[in-house]
Each structure stands twice: as C-alpha cells, then as structure tokens.
Amino acid sequence: MNYRRFGRTGWMVSELGYGMWGLASWTGSSDAESRQSLQRAVDLGCNFFDTAWHYGSGHSEQLLGELVRRNPGRKLYLATKIPPKNFAWPARPEFSLDDCFPPEHIEQYVRASVVNLGLESVDLIQFHSWSDTWLEDDRWVKKINDLRQQGLFQAVGISINRWEPRNGTRAVMSGLIDSVQVMYNVFDQNPEDELFPACTAQDVGVIARCPLDQGSLTGTLTLASKWPEGDWRNKHFNRATLKASVERANALKALVPPGMTLAQMALRFILNSPIVSTTIPGMRKVKNVEENLQIAGQGPLPGDLYRELRKHRWDRQAAR
C-alpha cells in the first residue's frame, strides 16, 4: 500500500481508502460480511475509513468502531459526517445555515457520532452537504472550533455536492477547512478546473469519492440492471441515466489493458492525480476489497492510456 499526505494535517493515509456507505444503507448488506471486508482491508494496509451518521442512522459508525477495537495496535484514520438538519441532499442555494447546520445540531451529531464509534475522539468530522453561502455565517466556525478544542475531533472537512466542485472553492480558500470530499473519477474530472488548484494552494486534503461512479465504472451494469424496491439506485439510475452510464462505460472497455479490470483502471486513473490524498471505493465483499486494493503500489497509468481516458470527461449537472 502507498500512503499519501492528507494535506496540512500531516497524516499519512492509504491512497486507497474505504467508503462505508454501502455497509448499512444498501439493500443486501450483511454485518458479518461487512466485518470480514473491513478487516481484510486493514490486513492489506488500508488505514482510512469514511463513514457518516446517515449511513444506517449510525450503524456504519458502530461497525467502524468495532473495527478499531479489533485492531488496537494499528492507527486507523476515521472520518465521519454530520447530516444536514433538514436531511436534504444536495444543499440548495436557498438553504440557510439554520436549515442545515445550526450550532446546536452540529454539536448534537458530533457527539452522537463519537458515541456510535465508542471512542473519545474522531480524526475527521465533515459536513455531509455544503454551500459556500454559509461562509457568511460564522456560527458554524465558532461551534466547530469549540468542539475541536474539547478534543472531540482533530480536523474538519466538507463533502461537496454532486457535480458542483466549484461550490466549495471559497471554503477551501478561506483557510477554515482541512479537507474536501468530492466526486472525482474518469467521468467527473471537473474538480481539476478550480477546486484542486485551491486545495494545492491551501494544503487541503482531498478525498475522491464515487471513484467507480456509483457502480457504472465497474462495467457490470447493463440496460436491464434493476435493484430491489427501496434501493436508492433505482432513483439514481433512471432510464436516461442508466443508458448514458452503460454506453460510456462500454466505450472504456476496449481501453482496459490485459490483466486489469475496468474498475482497477478507473481507480488508477484517480491515483494519477498527486493532489488526491485518498479515494474511497465502496467494498461490501472481500473479493471487491482484494480486487481494488490489488492496484496499491502499481504506480500511475501509462501516459498514453491516461491521456486517452481524459477524453472521456462527462460534465453533468444535478437536477434541482
């Protein structure tokens, strides 16, 4: 496993982290299987784990706390997120700080996450939605500073709205945050335009989320793909989105080198960017952990392949 510096925190985190959304929020998840997958990741050198209170109303956090206690001799970096008070994603321009992150709500969920983890402190607390308009209201800054001084967490970050990396650039340049979590993959390259240069300038850690584009960059989706009733993917992959995603993923398959999967190629594309501190694929099964972490230490993709993949940028806008 290779380790990268997590911005100004100085933490050395595994370039391949672990996204825990699917362990408590997706249909078909099993705690026993999740525990095995998490432990296998630790055994293979993964030391960065990203969860959130919203993932199973704290259940994903509880699984992560168990993992830490099973590995007392290893330093694992834990990142979790405060849900917006209105539980509405993405943050809309008309949402005020009181709608999403009033000070008392911030404190309530920071403390709830620490309790769920069963620890005295968490490494990174993130806002699970974000709007740069909230920079005008310093109440969140005062509350965050107060809770950090109490030792409840070490660093603070923001999770930026899907396909809106610009709506976080001001927060980065303010110097108030230590990290950003943003969609970045073969398709979603727009963080490179403004956000990544700002992160470089301010020495802010970068967490690349959705590295496999919610599953489309695994190459396993088809036009007939369906999910159980109530699964969030039914809404995300509506007919038009599924068709476009499958077509774009299929166009990449001819580029996959021998001995590599589409998912592995997609992950290595992300790691070609030196500003990325870690990327956090979701890995519910041990076989997924082993396949994804197999690329650790393999270095950047060949230049000609990387340049070809860059042509597959897909600029999208979230529906409002």
Functional labels for PLM-detected ranges:
Residues 1-76:
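N-terminal binding-site loop/beta-alpha segment at the start of enzyme catalytic domains
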Residues 6, 18, 34, 49, ...:
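Conserved, mostly hydrophobic/aromatic
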Residues 29-41, 100-117, 162-171:
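Short, acidic/polar
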Residues 34, 60, 106, 110, ...:
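Aromatic/hydrophobic pocket-lining residues that form the small-molecule binding cavity
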Residues 57, 129-320:
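Beta/alpha (TIM)-barrel catalytic core signal, keyed to glycine-rich beta->alpha loops juxtaposed to Asp/Glu
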Residues 74-87:
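A short, structured active-site edge motif that brings together acidic residues
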Residues 86-100:
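Surface-exposed, active-site-proximal loop segments in enzymatic domains
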Residues 114-133:
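Active-site groove signature of glycoside hydrolases
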